[in-house]
């Protein structure tokens, strides 16, 4: 696990975007795993500002709420269209179908699709309870794409996107931890003090279902990009491992 610590959240986003841009530009047919939520929004803005050519890129998203149609204003399908796809065309874009009549069958279909495509790089965020995608604490480390019930803390964290907590869906279809681990490369971005405890466990704890992101320690190609606040609880362990500041390796441009 390579950990890069930037001075600011914007710098962390720029570093992650630069990594993704380099990988996309270096391969003719590329499969990029995308995420939703607040973490990737700044990076998607950089995609648009640069008019990044993604015409050779196929995207697969991590998850989707169950019960929301693709046109629903709070669906992840709509999130991706509004924040990226409408301005940056991709070769193909795939998300789970949240309003599928049989969510279990849809999860199996999506698992098969992702496996057949083969993800070159997966972008991740991390929840305050250590979840990645919607793999909540207690999720089996070998889980495939599945239907999951969202914890109250996750629903509360996502409440800001809805009018009321009651409107936040209770279930989702999500790539499983094993599905995510099959990506050739993973870039995880975390910023802000609220993520510090989860980041500390991800880096310092042994792999455990109590903190799902700890499984990433077993992946050979993980880059974690943090700002100072997110790294604040693991500064000593990073120093002991000889990690350097990310700004020594990247030129940060406004």
Curated annotation (Swiss-Prot):
Q: Which reaction does it catalyse?
A: alpha-D-glucosamine 6-phosphate + H2O = beta-D-fructose 6-phosphate + NH4(+)
Biological processes, Gene Ontology terms: carbohydrate metabolic process; glucosamine catabolic process; N-acetylglucosamine catabolic process; N-acetylneuraminate catabolic process
**Gene Ontology CC terms, in alphabetical order:** cytoplasm
Q: Which Gene3D superfamilies match?
A: 3.40.50.1360
Q: According to its UniProt record, which residues of this chain constitute the active site?
A: 63, 129, 131, 136
Its UniProt pathway annotation is: Amino-sugar metabolism; N-acetylneuraminate degradation; D-fructose 6-phosphate from N-acetylneuraminate: step 5/5
Annotated EC:
3.5.99.6
Entry GO MF terms: glucosamine-6-phosphate deaminase activity; identical protein binding
- Give the record's keywords alphabetically: Carbohydrate metabolism, Hydrolase
Q: From which domain of life does this come?
A: Bacteria
Q: Name one Pfam family in it.
A: Glucosamine_iso
Q: What functional role does this protein have?
A: Catalyzes the reversible isomerization-deamination of glucosamine 6-phosphate (GlcN6P) to form fructose 6-phosphate (Fru6P) and ammonium ion.
**Membership in a protein family:** Belongs to the glucosamine/galactosamine-6-phosphate isomerase family. NagB subfamily.
According to UniProt, the name of this protein is Glucosamine-6-phosphate deaminase
The scientific name of the source species is Exiguobacterium sp. (strain ATCC BAA-1283 / AT1b)
At the highest ranks, the source species' classification is: Bacteria, Bacillati, Bacillota, Bacilli, Bacillales
Q: Which gene encodes it?
A: nagB
């Amino acid at each position: 696990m390579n950990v890069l610590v930037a001075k600011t959240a914007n710098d962390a986003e720029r570093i992650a975007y630069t990594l993704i841009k380099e990988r996309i530009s270096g391969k003719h047919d590329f499969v990029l795993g995308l995420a939703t939520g607040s973490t990737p929004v700044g990076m998607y803005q950089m995609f648009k500002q640069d008019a990044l050519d993604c015409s050779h890129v196929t995207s697969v998203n991590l998850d989707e709420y169950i019960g929301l149609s693709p046109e629903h204003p709070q669906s992840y399908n709509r999130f991706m269209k509004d924040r990226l796809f409408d301005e940056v065309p991709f070769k193909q874009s795939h998300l789970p179908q949240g309003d599928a009549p049989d969510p279990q069958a849809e999860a199996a279909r999506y698992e098969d699709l992702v496996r057949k495509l083969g993800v070159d790089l997966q972008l991740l965020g991390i929840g305050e309870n250590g979840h990645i995608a919607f793999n909540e604490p207690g999720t089996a480390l070998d889980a495939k794409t599945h239907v999951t019930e969202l914890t109250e803390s996750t629903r509360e964290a996502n409440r800001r996107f809805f009018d009321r907590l009651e409107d936040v869906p209770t279930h989702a279809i999500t790539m499983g931890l094993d599905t995510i681990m099959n990506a050739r490369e993973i870039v995880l971005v975390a910023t802000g003090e609220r993520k510090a405890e989860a980041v500390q466990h991800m880096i310092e704890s042994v792999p455990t279902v109590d903190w799902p992101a700890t499984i990433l320690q077993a992946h050979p190609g993980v880059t974690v990009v943090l700002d100072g606040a997110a790294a604040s609880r693991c500064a000593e362990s990073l120093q002991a491992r000889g990690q350097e500041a990310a700004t020594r390796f990247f030129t940060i441009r406004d």
